[in-house]
Swiss-Prot record:
Complex formation: F-type ATPases have 2 components, CF(1) - the catalytic core - and CF(0) - the membrane proton channel. CF(1) has five subunits: alpha(3), beta(3), gamma(1), delta(1), epsilon(1). CF(0) has three main subunits: a, b and c.
Main location: membrane
Keyword list, A-Z: ATP synthesis, Cell inner membrane, Cell membrane, CF(1), Hydrogen ion transport, Ion transport, Membrane, Transport
Function per UniProt: Produces ATP from ADP in the presence of a proton gradient across the membrane. The gamma chain is believed to be important in regulating ATPase activity and the flow of protons through the CF(0) complex.
Region Disordered, annotated ranges: 215-237
Record has Amino-acid biosynthesis as a keyword: no
NCBIfam families, alphabetized: ATPsyn_F1gamma
Record protein name field: ATP synthase gamma chain
Length: 323
């Protein structure tokens, strides 16, 4: 049986760890409330932007396919608009997906349960399945956990975006978007997909693979877990009137769509990380309490045994003196 001193040390050590996990749980809970508020405010706006863009894309899809087939740029030959109106924005022209960029959103730190494991494994499956299908796949990694994971596996990392989580705002999303758009605008990439955790609740996060560019005409989200009614599904029934024209609207709408989509994915991922961390720290607190209770019981038993032994020795000595 361990000595009383060693048991006391173990109890003290577990209590110190419990203080840390309790503090981390409180911090994660406070940050999660703010992150949830941001998502609640941003989701309807992002969905409406995608809805309008999808409507324009569906209307102008035949013109885009004709331009792509003829190898003509978005402005057409000699800058002539296609179909009597301004042609599609260059970022909307769909090309065969031979070269794909997967943008993987992970965290910089651990202690958040299976958050990083789930996203990394899903991204790895996507990378390998597309590679086996004959596509050239490259990765853009956000978060040190993703970088370390794919470096160990020799994955083709095109870009590692550091410091994104240090200051998460629209300017950060725009900077990320600029780096992702550079190879797409040069024709080095045919499609860009976001791989991230979508926040459902503090205990539930769903890994999704969502096409960023070119935007899909309908719901472009492929979920890891079956979930009905995804937040990103645009309404096909909506009809819009465009002023002054679709082309002028697209010049402003497409960059806005890219920035908002990236910002939303970043907020979703951050909230998912905080939810996973909150759950993990709550479980750690409960486990620590259970360990402390067991060690306290063991300590009391050992102390009782020691006291009983001393009493027996005293009684035995007293009886010996009487004799």
């Amino acid at each position: 049986m361990p000595s009383l001193k060693s048991i006391r040390k173990r109890i003290s050590s577990v209590k110190s760890t419990q203080k840390i996990t309790r503090a981390m749980k409180m911090v994660a809970g406070a940050k999660l409330n703010k992150a949830q508020l941001r998502i609640t405010e941003l989701r309807p706006y992002a969905v409406k932007v995608q809805e309008v863009l999808s409507a324009i894309t569906r209307d102008a899809a035949p013109a885009a396919e004709a331009l792509a087939a003829e190898g003509i740029g978005a402005e057409g030959e000699a800058g002539a608009p296609a179909g009597g109106e301004k042609a599609l924005h260059p970022l909307l022209v769909t090309r065969p997906e031979r070269r794909v960029l997967l943008v993987v959103l992970t965290s910089d730190r651990g202690l958040c349960g299976a958050f990083n494991t789930n996203i990394n494994k899903r991204a790895e499956r996507e990378w390998k399945s597309r590679t086996e299908a004959g596509q050239e796949v490259q990765l853009a990694i956000i978060g040190r956990k993703g970088r370390d994971y794919f470096n160990r596996r020799g994955a083709p990392i095109l870009e590692y975006l550091a410091g994104v989580w240090d200051k998460l705002n629209l300017e950060t999303a725009q900077a990320v978007g600029a780096k992702l758009l550079a190879p797409f605008n040069k024709g080095e990439i045919d499609a860009i997909y976001l791989v991230y955790n979508e926040f459902k609740s503090a205990i539930t996060q769903t890994v999704v693979v969502e096409r960023l560019l070119p935007p899909a005409g309908g719901p472009a989200k492929e979920q890891e877990q079956g979930d009905e009614g995804g937040h990103g599904a645009p309404s096909a029934a909506s009809e819009f009137l465009y002023e002054p024209d679709k082309g002028a609207l697209l010049e402003r709408l497409v960059p806005m769509y890219v920035d908002i989509s990236i910002l939303r994915a970043l907020y979703e991922s951050m909230a998912s990380e905080l939810g996973a961390k909150l759950t993990a720290m709550d479980a750690a607190n409960k486990n620590a309490k259970e360990v402390i209770d067991n060690l306290t019981l063991e300590y009391n038993k050992a102390r009782q045994a020691a006291i009983t032994k001393e009493l027996m020795e005293i009684i035995g000595g007293s009886e010996a003196l009487k004799e």
